[in-house]
């Protein structure tokens, strides 16, 4: 197979990719069997002359002969695909079915691989199936009726179900492509296999997770909703069972824990049961919203649909010399909305979400500042307490009814006069209250944001416009702790307990969590014998 990199094609070119390749490399005319687009990125640095940059795999007749003709082409090389390592099975017998805690990306992929290989896992998900959950979330957003066990954080698909559905990851691993192909089989658009920054949107994610659940069940797995694991039964430092919903006992010697970063009561239970964990850094801040046209103009210089491009994205970083902290954009959602994402009564949490089409006309992103144990303490649960403190203050500022505190950039920066939130663009439901965001974030966060906003305004025109709305608070950027695990991914303090995914501190996003769940299941199978 031949790999071609850095193939630059103007977005206005309408030729077939095969014609483009043969025009660029005439040595390939008549020799091409198949072309696979591995990656397609957008380069808008010289706007409005925007180009796609392709990486391709090309299968040809007489590869050795063709490569001799192309030997001086630095962007063309022979490529040998690295396949995922084959799954091997251990010889330790399983007296009971393996248990999976949580049905987010990590738990879902762990259960999927276990079921595919005949291990018949039982999944316990505290939240509801995606259809019931979607109704509960819509009711919360429209009416402010909150359900602590069925919300944006808990339920089928995990927190990612109500997000932009980004499938980007900095991780490189042969199994990622295999997982992506499964996602396409279950309803994701085929473009996720090659787009530089693929996304599926919350609408397609809901279809995907349901289809994956049905396949797990078809393969002999079981998925139980409204089923929270409330305790572990441990003998001689090893798992022997789990308690479900405070009463039911399920015997098992293997628990794969894919709980999310918002399962705080589960964190407390696991800490009580001596599961090793340590505090780790994360980031907190606010959501900022702009008219999507402002971002499109800055990034592309033209209206994107005229060139067949989607809503523009951005990624921003600011290194603060005064404090040594870093502010950055996080989970940017083009054409999306800011959503209420609480998982507990008495706290306001915001996040971003968009549909596959990204066509709301409003761009939003978290803008956050790093925090760590030096700020909140070194006890494993100190980060949770820190998050709760600022979420509670946001809840009270908003009126103690899940309305969120919001403020314009002009008000936040102390400009006079400054537009009010009522005259700005905002999308958070059930509603916002014009408040001082300095009252629901630590001073060492707000001071950095005050310096970051003008800096970013010099990079994206209009980013720090005084009328732009910011809504608080964003506190769930990543897990506030990390659970220990050894080379086999087992907890060093509780045998048979496998921490995995974002909630355990080993992933940051849908794809990395899915991969961590799959690889954890594969290592588990390498120890335990395949059931007859």
Region locations from a protein language model:
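Residues forming the flavin
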Residues: 1-52, 56-162, 166-532
């Amino acid at each position: 197979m031949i790999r071609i990199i850095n193939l630059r094609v103007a977005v206005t070119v309408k030729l077939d990719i095969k014609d483009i390749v043969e025009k660029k490399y005439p040595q390939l005319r008549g020799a091409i069997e198949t072309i696979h687009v591995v990656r397609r990125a957008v380069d808008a640095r010289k706007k409005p002359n925007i180009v796609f940059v392709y990486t391709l795999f090309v299968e040809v007749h007489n590869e050795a002969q063709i490569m001799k003709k192309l030997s001086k082409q630095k962007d063309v090389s022979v490529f040998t695909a690295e396949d995922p390592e084959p799954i091997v099975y251990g010889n330790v017998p399983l007296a009971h079915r393996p248990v999976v805690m949580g049905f987010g990306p990590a738990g879902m992929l762990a259960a999927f691989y276990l079921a595919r290989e005949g291990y018949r896992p039982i999944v316990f998900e505290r939240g509801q199936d995606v259809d019931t959950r979607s109704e509960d979330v819509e009711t919360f957003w429209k009416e402010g009726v909150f359900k602590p066990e069925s919300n944006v954080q808990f339920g089928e698909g995990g927190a990612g179900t109500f997000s932009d559905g980004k499938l980007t990851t900095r991780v490189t691993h042969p199994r990622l492509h295999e997982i992506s192909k499964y996602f396409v089989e279950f309803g994701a658009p085929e473009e996720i296999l090659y787009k530089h920054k693929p996304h599926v949107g919350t609408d397609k994610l809901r279809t995907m997770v349901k289809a994956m659940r049905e396949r797990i069940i078809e393969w002999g797995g079981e998925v139980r909703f409204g089923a929270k694991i409330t305790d572990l039964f441990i003998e001689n430092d090893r798992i022997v069972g789990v308690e479900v919903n405070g009463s039911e006992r399920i015997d098992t010697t293997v628990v794969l824990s894919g709980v999310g970063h918002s399962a705080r009561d589960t964190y407390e239970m696991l800490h009580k049961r001596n599961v090793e964990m340590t505090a780790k850094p994360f980031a907190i801040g606010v959501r900022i919203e702009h008219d999507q046209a402002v971002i499109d103009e800055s990034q592309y210089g033209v209206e994107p649909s005229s060139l067949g491009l989607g809503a523009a994205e951005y990624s921003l970083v600011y290194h603060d010399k005064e404090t040594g902290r870093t502010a950055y954009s996080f989970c940017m959602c083009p054409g999306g909305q800011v959503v209420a994402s609480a998982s507990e009564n008495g706290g306001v949490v915001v996040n971003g979400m968009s549909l596959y089409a990204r066509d709301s006309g409003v761009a939003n992103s978290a803008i956050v500042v790093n925090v760590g144990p030096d700020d909140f303490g070194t006890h494993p649960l100190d980060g949770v307490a820190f998050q709760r403190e600022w979420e509670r203050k946001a809840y009270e500022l908003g009126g103690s009814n899940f309305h969120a505190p919001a403020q314009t950039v002009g008000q936040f920066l102390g400009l006079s006069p400054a537009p009010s939130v009522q005259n700005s663009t905002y999308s958070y439901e059930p509603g916002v209250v014009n408040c001082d965001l300095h009252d629901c974030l630590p001073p060492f966060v707000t001071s950095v944001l005050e310096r970051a906003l003008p800096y970013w305004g010099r990079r994206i025109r209009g980013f720090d416009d005084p009328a732009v709305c910011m809504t608080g608070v964003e506190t769930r950027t990543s897990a506030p702790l990390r659970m220990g695990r050894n080379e086999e991914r087992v907890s060093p303090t509780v045998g048979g307990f496998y921490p995995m995914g974002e909630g355990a501190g080993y992933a940051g996003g849908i794809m990395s969590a899915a991969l961590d769940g799959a690889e954890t299941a594969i290592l588990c199978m390498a120890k335990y014998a395949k059931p007859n």
